[in-house]
Amino acid sequence: MEDCNGEDIIATPELPLEIIVYIQSFLQASDRKDASLVCRSWYYASQDFHFQKNLTFSFPASASSLELIKGLGRKSRCSLIIKQLDGFSMSRSLLMEVGLCLGSKLESLALPGSSITEASLLSLLPRLTSLRRLDLRGLDSLFMSGAFLSREEHRHQVRSALSGLEELDLSDLRYLSDLTFNRLTSCTPGLRRLSLAGCHIAFEFDPYRGCPAGAVKDSSALLSLRNLKRLVTEQRWTLVALDLSRTSITPDSLRTVAQVPDLVLEELRLHGCKELTDYSIEVLVKHQPSLQRLDISACTELTSRSVEAVAQGLKALTQLSLSRDWRITEKGLAELLSVSSLRSLDLSECLHVSGTEIVKGLTGCTTARAQLDTLSLKSCTYIRDFAVFSLTQLLGNTLRELDLTLCVNVTDLSVRAIATYLQGLVVLRLGLCKEITDWGLLGMVEATKCEPDQETADKGPRFTRTFGNMGFFKPPRLPFDEKPKLVTHNDLQQFKQQAGASLLALNRLQELDLSACPKLTDSSITQVLRYPDLRRLSLSMLPEITDASLASVACHCRSLTSLALSHCPGISDRGVAQAAPYLHRLQHLYLSGCSNITDRSLFLLLQHCDRLQTLDISSCKNISPTTVDLLQSRLPFLENVHHKFIETRSCYRKK
């Protein structure tokens, strides 16, 4: 081949498809989609089987979704989340298209926030022959009449299609009854996971008939314990996960379920079941010793006796949630942390936990102790620096997620310990830790920390000019009233030269929450927040940060999909103008209470952030409703726009 000058052109060889697939394996799904537009080879690579498994497409019901569904028909398999379906013709056409194009390829279907008719779903389900997961949570419109699947021919069609269904979510169904439950579950003989969270289940008493629950066979008004036990007994060989959260299950009812012969549960969720007692947990542990994941959060009657029972009886436990179990103390936690299989522990809002027994349990036998990768101590106000320092050393090799939100006694010492020992962290939450300052994030020690403060030095009593209060002396200044000591230019130069443990060391972070840490300023945010893989960042309620922080974060954290800057008075259009060109991946943006944000920022988002799904501009009084409407009409993926209190000014003008 020759060019216009008669010289030979050497053709550049194409990369092998396997190499392109390997390159794309390092990209996020959204970036891989953009890369597929480069050329045909890159498109074929993006369709590789490894990228298609566990792929879920989420979109609202609209006319434009019809073309999307037709395009998905070329994939070998996929999962769908379709929102806001109703009983009108467009939604019916959408479901029909799903059945025609994806019937044999669809693995999972969820219909949140929808109100569809029985006829629409019954025309779809017989076509979904490969379905493994069905989510019908909150679809009261299906069960209100009680006629769903009442005809034998419909049940036969659905049973033929759903014989391989493994997961069924029936959470928050107000009108679920014995009749409708039996009809539906008779079509799904091989269930592995069942969720009935938030359903109205009569465990002991039938309020409609004034008799014990289950006395009336196949009630058309409510779902009874007798019927639930029947299902668990019939499918005991396959059922491994059960969710009864937010129900009124009693200790006797839990024992009835746990004692079903040959039932071997691996996961049980009982969040918010406030009738449960320590005795019921002891019985559960005795009859279901193979449990690996247990959620007994917000069961407010439970005490440390339950913790001891779990520690002694569940030796295969990997995940445990005790969140909001307010009566739990330190007792039993040391023994719990000796369960070597434990990987995730949630103690958030356990107000009596100080961390002492956790440290004690982890410092026991090194061969038989928990290797935690997730630890939540949110709102454990007794947690102090010593506990955090010890935990970071003991869990340094395994911990990937740490939540210290509202641990008000945590200071810069804890931040430095985290930066030193937990360099594999992926998620770090420090929101509302009000004692954290720039010095902690920078990994430096404040120069004047050990010197007596002139303001607080004892100079004897000082009188005030106001004699009408309780006394004559000036009250001591409260710690949270003090302005943080500013980091100077010389301090920053020292930071750049030293090899101290700053938050920069956490270069694997994907989520960081520093909201409501009021002593943080631009000095640390601009120097430390430089994470190429960071996805979610919250800097809300930081009164000292300005546009400089926003611009720096956008420049150095270009993978951000969620950014929260609510109630940051120093953020303005100028910062958005500097940041928006770097935030192409942004999907969720929170700017409520940022009074210096105007219409100009919305036009910048329209220009640069076309993937935006959620926008919160509540109380941004310099934004006009007209611009909000324009933004909603132009951004194809924008689903949620919160704009309370922005019409105030225009309303006054009309008056």
Task: Give, region by region, the residue ranges found by the protein language model.
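Conserved positional slot within leucine-rich repeat
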Residues: 56, 81, 110, 135, ...
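Tandem repeat domain/solenoid detector
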Residues: 251-252, 266, 278-282, 286, ...
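Acidic, serine/threonine- and proline-enriched intrinsically disordered linkers and terminal tails
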Residues: 202-222, 443-506
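Leucine-rich repeat
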Residues: 103, 128, 162, 173, ...
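N-terminal adaptor-interaction module of cullin-RING ubiquitin ligase components
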Residues: 1-260, 265-272, 277, 281-285, ...
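Flexible, disordered linker segments and immediate boundary regions flanking tandem C2H2 zinc-finger modules
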Residues: 194, 206-209, 347, 357-358, ...
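C-terminal interaction modules of eukaryotic adaptor/scaffold proteins
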Residues: 560, 582-655
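Alpha-helix termini
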Residues: 153-159, 230-233, 262, 364-369, ...
